Amino acid sequence: MTLTASSSSRAVTNSPVVVALDYHNRDAAMAFVDKIDPRDCRLKVGKEMFTLFGPQFVRELQQRGFDIFLDLKFHDIPNTAAHAVAAAADLGVWMVNVHASGGARMMTAAREALVPFGKDAPLLIAVTVLTSMEASDLADLGVTLSPADYAERLAALTQKCGLDGVVCSAQEAVRFKQVFGQEFKLVTPGIRPQGSDAGDQRRIMTPEQALAAGVDYMVIGRPVTQSVDPAQTLKAINASLQRSA
């Protein structure tokens, strides 16, 4: 498996690493970003930072050369979700996501909203089962399937609706590649280099394990953002992935 990522012509990196920016303070976030190279990773902006700092924050990251995964997990009626996804495309992000549990009509509407953007459209990914959830959490919601089985059901629906791939745990990646094919992109949080604390992610893997499992894009947060030397940490991760490829 190569490290070449399939994305739009805007992409400046072939690294599968996506760094999760989880900061409460804008200046701290920018201080971190200015230490790293857009050739070594992409950046993920989630609900907290987008709510705090808005679209302009995303534009500033893009001006520094970074591809952005806008991780807002849209989940609404089809028309609203479609407009939200189109707004993300207008912002020029590299990837955007929705909740697969929003259903087929919602996901189809979101996909159709990106058609006018052509090759400049962001990758559209669906969230299956959050990596923090265990079987007991699903049971509380009335879902009797295991996290893996439920994620596979939602992934199948996602592919049927024509989306580019899913967010899933690394443990599901091997089977998903077998079932859904190589072109169906797998985006995986809960990736932590050897020796890192597991944090609040229940189902985790190292970057090397994730690559071997078939993960296309791996989200890494605190092991990079809290590193004394984040630029070197990223280079070490990428070098390790190149050796493992």
From Swiss-Prot:
Domain of life of the source: Bacteria
Gene3D superfamilies: Aldolase class I (3.20.20.70)
Cross-referenced CDD domains: OMP_decarboxylase_like
Amino-acid positions noted as binding substrate in the UniProt annotation, renumbered to this chain: 22, 44, 71-80, 131, 192, 201, 221-222
Pfam families in alphabetical order: OMPdecase
The entry's keywords: Decarboxylase, Lyase, Pyrimidine biosynthesis
EC code: 4.1.1.23
Associated pathway: Pyrimidine metabolism; UMP biosynthesis via de novo pathway; UMP from orotate: step 2/2
Residues forming coiled coils: none
Function according to Swiss-Prot or TrEMBL: Catalyzes the decarboxylation of orotidine 5'-monophosphate (OMP) to uridine 5'-monophosphate (UMP).
Name of the protein this chain belongs to: Orotidine 5'-phosphate decarboxylase
Lineage: Bacteria, Pseudomonadati, Pseudomonadota, Gammaproteobacteria, Enterobacterales
